[in-house]
Amino acid sequence: MERFKLNTTLSYLVAVSGGPDSMFMLNELIKMNIKEIVVCHVNYNFREDSWKDQKLVEDFCLKNNLKLEKLIINQDYSKLKENFESWARNIRYDFFVEISKKYNIQNVLIAHNRNDLVETFLLQQDRKGYVKHYGLNKTSTYKEITIVRPMLNILKSEILKSLKEENIAFVIDSTNEDKKYKRNKIRANLSESTFNDFEETIKKLNKKLEIINLEVNWYVNNNMSADELKINKNLQDQDLEFIQRTIYKWLEVIKKDFVIQNRRNKTIFEIAKNIKVSEKVFWEINIGEYSIIKDYENLFIIETKAIQPKTILIKSKEDLYLSEEFINWLDLLNAIKRNKENYPYVITNDFLTYKLNTYTFGKKTNRYLIDKKIRYKNRMLKAVVYSTKTKKILNTIK
């Protein structure tokens, strides 16, 4: 009898650690005549005996003629500055994305069970942070892949019983007993007999979330321009939870939600709070390799390296090729030609500096930028060119 339902005409990547849950799932999958299975295993070398996990998975795949992709990590964990669980999850899921591209398989099976669902809910309650979905969702996305959890209706006790009956080997991760991890503390005090009550609470909370998310979806769908989110009074008048959900939804729509996955809740809270209370027309919040920027009534996300200030001195015609670093390079060249190539010139997108020491249409550039409400996005991405002699900006800022 099939323990869970899957479309057997599809191909799947299967995340297998060697623990009881993933070994149970893999053992059940090979009974189902699925089109294609590719096993994915990550050895973090976090424990001295982690090679045993890898060996177990290798032997099982060899015995059952299964494709296996491995990622072996060599990391000095004494130098790891971020939370291990979040770091490991990113490593693991990015590996799935890589293997997904290699085999052209979109779906990844994860062996979360019914116990994990309840434990996750209790962790969410304890942390009191942003919750996208209470408990665990049957499906979710990470970058280009779909995460599928087919075992959320199966108890841990059922899994262990099945493994024993079928004589399937598995390993126990010793860190699962370490009480310094909050999930392990919760697990130690949980009884499967209480799960029905917890699941009823989870259902009720998720129904409330559905109503809120309908409103969030409506706002995002009706207030987007290209990949930017419009900020208006309707959003600013909402509570911080609604604004946070709106940010998440917007990033999800433009496929940039991976930027904030596993980030501390205070990052999104800070963005939401700025939207609600800040009267500034411009602010920037850095999130790793990306920045989220408020630009008048617009919110956009961009790679931080794309908006780094650059300044180039053009001493002669031979230096003109340097202007190609900027997206509006042709505009810059035409401006220099109109000025009869009266070298030297400065080309820069460092608007915080040039706005104070240059002139545009007879007024200080800072005043011009304010009066014309020139978008900060354009100031950062597009360069200006001015003569070092007159300090007059030669191209049109728009």
From Swiss-Prot:
ATP binds at residues 17-22. It comes from the Bacteria. It is found in: Cytoplasm. Its EC number is 6.3.4.19. One of its GO terms (cellular component) is cytoplasm. Pfam families: ATP_bind_3. One of its GO terms (biological process) is tRNA modification. One of its GO terms (molecular function) is tRNA(Ile)-lysidine synthase activity. Keywords: ATP-binding, Cytoplasm, Ligase, Nucleotide-binding, tRNA processing. Its main location: cytoplasm. It catalyses: cytidine(34) in tRNA(Ile2) + L-lysine + ATP = lysidine(34) in tRNA(Ile2) + AMP + diphosphate + H(+). Belongs to the tRNA(Ile)-lysidine synthase family. The N-terminal region contains the highly conserved SGGXDS motif, predicted to be a P-loop motif involved in ATP binding. Ligates lysine onto the cytidine present at position 34 of the AUA codon-specific tRNA(Ile) that contains the anticodon CAU, in an ATP-dependent manner. Cytidine is converted to lysidine, thus changing the amino acid specificity of the tRNA from methionine to isoleucine. This is tRNA(Ile)-lysidine synthase. It comes from Mesoplasma florum (strain ATCC 33453 / NBRC 100688 / NCTC 11704 / L1) (Acholeplasma florum).
